[in-house]
Amino acid sequence: MAWLICLWIFNLMEKPAQKPHYPYFSSGPCAKPPGWSFDNLKNAALSRSHSSGAAVKKLQEVIDKSRQLLEIPDDYLIGIVPASDTGAVEMAMWCMLGQRGVEVYSWENFGHDWNIDAGEQLPLKDKKLIKAEYGELPDFSNSNPDNDIVFTWNGTTAGVRIKNTDWISNQRKGLTICDATSAVFSMHMDWHKLDVITYSWQKVLGSEAAHGMLILSPRAVERLETFTPPWPIPKIFRLANNQKLISGIFSGATINTPSMISVEDVLNSLNWGLELGGLNKLIDISETNLKLVNNWIDKHDNFEFLAKDPETRSCTSICILPKDEWFKTLNDEDKVNFMKEVCSLLESNEAGYDLNSYKTAPPGIRIWGGSTVENKNVELVLPWIDWAYLTTKEAFKK
């Protein structure tokens, strides 16, 4: 009997035979689209002014193809803004909040950051800050349609997404400001429930960092043209002058100088998505990645989802935790160090990069499952995660 147990342990510890052919699972910047190469950038408008006709044409093309791929309503404005998704969210909050009461819903790191903006940085008089722990959603049921609402569609650091937008009133008087950076292109957006939508190029599109996208409904534009906040607005955040929308932002005249090589790269990603089959195809890839992880967890004892409710599990930032009793006996510092060793082992074997959970999240694994991550690569990294976990566990126990 003892030799059978030893053989079983040996088989668990044996390295998987196959590695992902593209072992990149970072949650930002994320994996490049399949087949990407530097040749894709050869037509970039390099050495040209970003306000030249050639550059503005490319910037406008980013706007137009984003609308096409995301199926954004025609009466919504789309702008390219500085400082990635963070810049887009904060310019919306600083330019639009203050007219009404505001509710900020958060359940992971970046949502908590918007909570800090509303709760500590902006002098808002009427505010409700509604938080939930990692792995859970806050209670949306008492949301007041007279208030402005700030929330993330998908919590990137928790792997928890909203179930639906039923809690947002069609007769709302307030604005909804949605950080959708790890949701767009991999999840269907309920555009008519959203007034301000933000995201970056570096997430599901697999493009480069530092550039954000800001999408405004007609109601959001009306707010900018009828309300001026009582605090100063830096130029980098400014969307209106004297209650008049700076419309150039939404036609390729960016607030500051964009990287034209990054512009070319995001155009490549948008073209890839359109040629692949559009939004539904991108969503299908990502949802299949979640199913692969779910099926693997169902058959193994080492991990569980951070999100307990299956309906809230993200198909992009897929967060899993060790669940065996041995791991639970470790103190917090040892849990963090243990998972660092697991991820270091995966990297040293070139089986998977950047799989560690976010620094403020419970120690675990975060697999990026966005649409640029091919299903086969997710399928192949899972046995490697098992192997790395068991191998590290044996070393830790000695």
List where the protein language model places each region:
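N-terminal "arm"/small-domain region of PLP-dependent enzymes with the aminotransferase-like
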Residues: 8-53
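Conserved N-terminal alpha-helix of the aminotransferase class I/II PLP-enzyme fold
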Residues: 39-91, 95, 109-117, 298
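Conserved PLP-dependent catalytic core of the aminotransferase class-I/II
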Residues: 65-73, 272-307, 345
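PLP-dependent aminotransferase-like
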Residues: 87, 94-149
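Active-site phosphate-binding strand-loop segment of PLP-dependent enzymes
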Residues: 133-185, 196, 204
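Conserved active-site segment immediately N-terminal to the catalytic lysine
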Residues: 191-202, 212
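Active-site C-terminal subdomain of aminotransferase-like
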Residues: 202-295
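Conserved C-terminal alpha-helix-loop-beta "cap" of PLP-dependent enzymes
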Residues: 298, 302-376, 380
